[in-house]
Amino acid sequence: MAKHNETGTQAEILAEQHLVSQGLTPLARNYHCKGGEIDLIMQQQRALVFVEVRFRKSAAFGSAAASVTRSKQQKIVTAAQHFLMDNSKLANLPCRFDVVAITAGQIEWIENAFTLNE
């Protein structure tokens, strides 16, 4: 496994552990479809939470959160729509898009980081 893939996997595990400690339940990790990918799919009470995990060793080149571009957001939304089509039992739950940014070892959980309309 390439070093960056290994680091990404470790960041996703750390993010998932953090979200579980906050009361969320994991449903899927690294959900792929033709149009995109979602790092984590969690459930918080009766809401589905689609999570993008971003990692930076330092903030020297910008924050981890700032690296979630509009293009990346659109790919996450496309993947979320695909997930909901594949999992019709969950399709009526409210959904949101969060980012977990890990920069220099600090975890920042940004709820409702973006919406479908952005």
UniProtKB/Swiss-Prot annotation:
CDD domains, per database record: PoNe_Nuclease
What protein name is recorded for this chain?
A: UPF0102 protein Sde_3146
Q: Which family does it belong to?
A: Belongs to the UPF0102 family.
Mind telling me which InterPro entries this protein's record contains? Restrct_endonuc-II-like (IPR011335), tRNA_endonuc-like_dom_sf (IPR011856), UPF0102_YraN-like (IPR003509)
The record, for Gene3D superfamilies, names:
3.40.1350.10
Question: Which PANTHER family does the annotation name?
Answer: UPF0102 PROTEIN YRAN
> At the top level of its lineage, which domain of life is listed?
Bacteria
GO molecular function terms listed in the Swiss-Prot or TrEMBL record: nucleic acid binding
Q: Name one Pfam family in it.
A: UPF0102
